[in-house]
Curated annotation (Swiss-Prot):
Gene: URM1
Species this chain originates from: Lodderomyces elongisporus (strain ATCC 11503 / CBS 2605 / JCM 1781 / NBRC 1676 / NRRL YB-4239) (Yeast)
Location, primary (coarse class): cytoplasm
GO molecular function terms noted in the UniProt entry: protein homodimerization activity; protein tag activity; sulfur carrier activity
Residues bearing PTM 1-thioglycine: 101
Cross-link (Glycyl lysine isopeptide (Gly-Lys) (interchain with K-? in acceptor proteins)), chain numbering: 101
Annotated family: Belongs to the URM1 family.
An example Gene Ontology biological process: cellular response to oxidative stress
Pfam families, sorted: Urm1 (PF09138)
Coiled coil: none
Localization (cell): Cytoplasm
Protein name: Ubiquitin-related modifier 1
Keyword tRNA processing belongs to the record: yes
Amino acid sequence: MPIKIKVEFLGGLDVIASSVRDHKVTLPYEEGEATMKEAVNYIAENLVTDPKDIPVFIEDGTVRAGILVLINDTDWELEGKEDYLVENGDVLIFTSTLHGG
């Protein structure tokens, strides 16, 4: 059964995803098979509207520095970052901590 998650883009990061903050996403993986690395790649390929904006989100194969990543309201660094196994019902929040002035 595919994994259903919620993805939120905050801190102005929603501009890369058609200015939509909340997304319901179905990952094409079985539960226990998808790591955050696969989820982030899927999100970049399917939610980022303009391919030119992918570097705003991804750098060197991972989420760009300056973007806070929360998995179910917990910093992803405490959950194993890219190695975390995504579960059905997870909420992934990406918040830009860099703002223009």
